[in-house]
């Protein structure tokens, strides 16, 4: 679970490190905090009962961690909510680890959350991880222009992702549902 100035951003030009996607160099987590709308995602097991787009809210904590609240609507109209936390995995803030559940109720299970592309004004974010099994395009607004979405898919392609794997929810018109 759970982010429009240039059509091709620096993230698209960095390439790959050891065959893995390359996160942006740094992220100001205070600016990153807040509400994000899911524009597109690679379908995954923990969102398989969500219909349409989800939202993610990130709130900074005093201990340096981040509270994560993901919400989506289920087919029956109910809101599904998942609460978790994130912690920094690097000094630049672009590599985080998130946990939404624990083993035996006390040992968290952490997953990678890498910010691969980020708008200069923090108006969009592209999130992924090393295996490319998971990926999201997030925006500060519920929709995104088709041209911006296509540029973000190009950024993902340059990072080794296949845009056709993405399910699109918040595109303006023409790109909706295309993922390519």
Each predicted region: which residue ranges?
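A beta-rich soluble binding module of mature secreted/lumenal proteins
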Residues: 8-180
């Amino acid at each position: 679970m759970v982010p429009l100035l240039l059509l091709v951003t620096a993230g698209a030009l960095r390439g790959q490190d050891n065959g893995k996607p390359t996160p942006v160099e740094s992220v100001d987590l205070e600016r990153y905090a807040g509400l994000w709308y899911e524009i597109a995602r690679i379908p995954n097991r923990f969102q398989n009962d969500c219909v349409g787009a989800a939202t993610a809210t990130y709130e900074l904590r005093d201990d340096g961690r981040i509270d994560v609240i993901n919400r989506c609507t289920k087919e029956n109209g109910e809101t599904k909510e998942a609460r978790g936390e994130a912690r920094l995995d690097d000094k630049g803030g672009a590599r985080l680890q998130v946990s939404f559940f624990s083993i035996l109720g006390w040992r968290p299970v952490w997953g990678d959350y890498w910010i691969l592309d980020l708008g200069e004004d923090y108006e969009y974010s592209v999130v992924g991880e090393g295996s490319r099994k998971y990926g999201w395009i997030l925006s500060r607004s519920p929709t995104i222009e088709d041209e911006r979405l296509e540029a973000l898919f190009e950024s993902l392609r340059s990072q080794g992702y296949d845009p056709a794997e993405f399910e699109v929810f918040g595109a303006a018109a023409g790109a909706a549902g295309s993922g390519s």
